[in-house]
Amino acid sequence: MSVLNDTPGLLDALRGEMTPKFLATRSPDGAPNVVPCITLLPAEDAPDTLTFGNFLLRKSIKNLEQDRRVGILVITTDLQGWILTGDFLEFQRTGPYVDRQMSSSLLRYNAYTGIRNAGVIRVRSMEATFAIPRLEVLRDFALARLSAIRGWGQGEEGVPVPLPVRREFAKMVAVKVLAWVSPTGYPVVVPAISMQPGGNTSLVCWNGTPGLPHPPPGASVATNILTLDAVSYQAKGTWSASGRAGAIQVREIYAGGPPLPGGRIA
């Protein structure tokens, strides 16, 4: 059985050059890292194999050099999505995978053109599929906002979330995800569209989509936002939950793109 070939809609979504895709990696001590990885594409010459360009992925590459386990989220503009796990295999400096990455519109016309190499991932499992109705997005965003107003998830610990980051996470029309390391040791990435500022040092969300996994209380988590303007930030911290409400006490914040891709800003 082929995970990619036997899952309706997944290959077409992966082939979309602008389809939002996220790659989660882990450090040796189990800290998750999750970033947009739009360059993820299916390898047309091998089953259940993905390639990606080494482009603005500094922390991810460092993690892959120490632990090959990855989590992947693919989500379409219609909010249909797939949650995968996989194993990083290798980097290739030359060959068809590199050529295909370099010929993509994302890299061909980018001011920061060029990839160092192409990474190869073997898909291991399909963890979940989902489809999020638009009305559910509105409902969950409102419920998360209500939780924040009521003070849920606020605390004295953590670092203040900078205003530019708060402004982006306050947007409803953006792709937001949540990642953590599962008991199997593999990172898991799920949609968290309702993620938004809570207190000065927290982010809150509402888990209204049935069937999706969620991190246990106290877990080390990472969340990332990708806006329509290709702005991205990543926040890391500690997870707490009460019913369907969840919160992150933020410990670290990173920029996702130029001029400081992967650089810590808080």
Predicted regions and their residues:
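Binding-site signature for planar aromatic cofactors or substrates
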Residues: M1-A266
